[in-house]
Curated annotation (Swiss-Prot):
SUBUNIT field: Heterodimer with AGAMOUS capable of binding to CArG-box sequences. Interacts with AGL16. Interacts with TT16/AGL32.
This protein's name: Developmental protein SEPALLATA 1
Residues in coiled coil: 85-176
Role, per record: Probable transcription factor. Functions with SEPALLATA2/AGL4 and SEPALLATA3/AGL9 to ensure proper development of petals, stamens and carpels, and to prevent the indeterminate growth of the flower meristem. Forms a heterodimer via the K-box domain with AGAMOUS, that could be involved in genes regulation during floral meristem development.
Alphabetized Pfam families for the sequence: K-box, SRF-TF
PROSITE patterns reported for this sequence: K_BOX (PS51297), MADS_BOX_1 (PS00350), MADS_BOX_2 (PS50066)
CDD domains: MADS_MEF2_like
GO terms for cellular component: nucleus
Encoding gene per record: SEP1
Length: 251
């Protein structure tokens, strides 16, 4: 009679279970060896008993190399397929982060412009006030520095204009000195004659325009013989001093 069909279930008898494990383990190791030799295949077999004892077989010289090869073949494709998904997930997280930062900056800008201040509490309002004060101080400082720079430029331009004016004045004085020197050396007699004539006319003008010493209390329309005599005497004296000739209406 042949062997009956063995039911595949856990052997409850401990001794029978250990005997069956030893027989089948040796048969499995033998089959792995035969497969590697007959088919020139790289075979690795790892067995752990129920007590945790290790049994292994490897057709190559190093079990770790076979395990690395198995890991690359089994999980490498999964990592390659999951790489775009991971990159997409990371990109989406970065997008959410940048979006939140952008919305926060927009909210801060509106708050600086005095908008959307209702949701802010007292602490946030104080912080916003300090931020505005700092910005205002910085703007004033930059404005003051700009005005000081402009003032310095204007002072430099003023100094340059003063130096230019001083140089032109010195040049003008030199030109006047040279001209006076030439005139004094070539036309002495003509210059003296012009001076005498100018003095003569000046004396006449001063004599003609001397004030008349009349009584200021005299009224218009009343003849005063004393004042008339004084006017006549003064006019005759001035005419004699001027050219020695007395007009007929004065006689």
């Amino acid at each position: 009679m042949g062997r009956g069909r063995v039911e595949l279930k856990r052997i409850e008898n401990k001794i029978n279970r250990q005997v069956t494990f030893a027989k089948r383990r040796n048969g499995l190791l033998k089959k792995a060896y035969e497969l590697s030799v007959l088919c020139d295949a790289e075979v690795a077999l790892i067995i752990f008993s129920n007590r945790g004892k290790l049994y292994e077989f490897c057709s190559s010289s190093n079990m770790l190399k076979t395990l690395d090869r198995y890991q690359k073949c089994s999980y490498g494709s999964i990592e390659v397929n999951n790489k775009p998904a991971k990159e997409l997930e990371n990109s989406y997280r970065e997008y959410l982060k940048l979006k939140g930062r952008y919305e926060n900056l927009q909210r801060q800008q509106r708050n600086l412009l005095g908008e959307d201040l209702g949701p802010l509490n007292s602490k946030e309002l104080e912080q916003l006030e300090r931020q505005l004060d700092g910005s205002l101080k910085q703007v004033r400082s930059i404005k003051t520095q700009y005005m000081l720079d402009q003032l310095s430029d204007l002072q430099n331009k003023e100094q340059m204009l003063l130096e230019t004016n001083r140089a032109l004045a010195m040049k003008l004085d030199d030109m006047i000195g040279v001209r006076s020197h030439h005139m004094g050396g070539g036309g002495g007699w003509e210059g003296g004659e012009q001076n005498v004539t100018y003095a003569h006319h000046q004396a006449q003008s001063q004599g003609l325009y001397q004030p008349l010493e009349c009584n200021p209390t005299l009224q218009m329309g009343y003849d005063n013989p004393v004042c008339s005599e004084q006017i006549t005497a003064t006019t005759q004296a001035q005419a004699q001093q001027g050219n020695g000739y007395i007009p007929g209406w004065m006689l």
